[in-house]
């Protein structure tokens, strides 16, 4: 879906200037909310969200155009690449208890692993479900592991309406700090969950376990989950662990920079969580309810 870049100014004594080249409609909607809430303020603020890196010439031009304007812009991709890239993320977080058991080749997997144990094999650089396969251990010996990450499937996942789900939570990095946004949503698998017994073909496994966005994907607000309060607490703890592991990278996020990270969590039957991947340039194309309840409040 194509979104045209937009550059617009909102003012009611409080001055807010916004540039976005990704779903600018949501940024404008969030900006109007901010404008109403800060009516009468004399602050002058600029926000730049670029899917690549902010143009320093734009920052300079805004500050020259409006003396005293505070301009905040998305952190350069180089500062968050080790969070976003699948192989780099896996290597960095491998020892954390808040990610799946992680391997980079068949020979690393313990030999006493049950034949029907499932593993996700993810190709570096893939987006969404593209480049993600799921295999039983018995079928993995001859796979290609070049530039791939192997994550072991959790044994007993939590279910929604008898199906697996994946939570998308937003984490904001700003001025060396980490913030977990308190609203999130989940996407639900297309097929009911069944334990892997005997041979199951790749397509059947994908429909149960590889959860991705299509025109027919079911979205729910995370607060609809039975264990939501516990899951929310555990996501916060996982984010604290992330902050510790990535402390050097987070220290590089300056006072005038921010990053909005999309954390994908899976949840077990006890409400425990695992971060399966992080996206440092999220896609905000979601159903209207998710936009109104999660995306716009986040951007605001």
Which residues are covered by each model-predicted region?
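Hydrophobic residue at the +6 position relative to the catalytic HRD Asp in the kinase catalytic loop
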Residues: 263-265
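A residue-level signal for conserved active-site and pocket-lining positions in enzyme catalytic cores
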Residues: 89, 93, 169, 278
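A short acidic/small-residue loop/turn micro-motif
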Residues: 281-283
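Conserved N-proximal alpha/beta basic substrate-recognition cap immediately N-terminal to
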Residues: 3-118, 125-127
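Catalytic core of tubulin tyrosine ligase-like
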Residues: 116, 124-259, 268-273, 279, ...
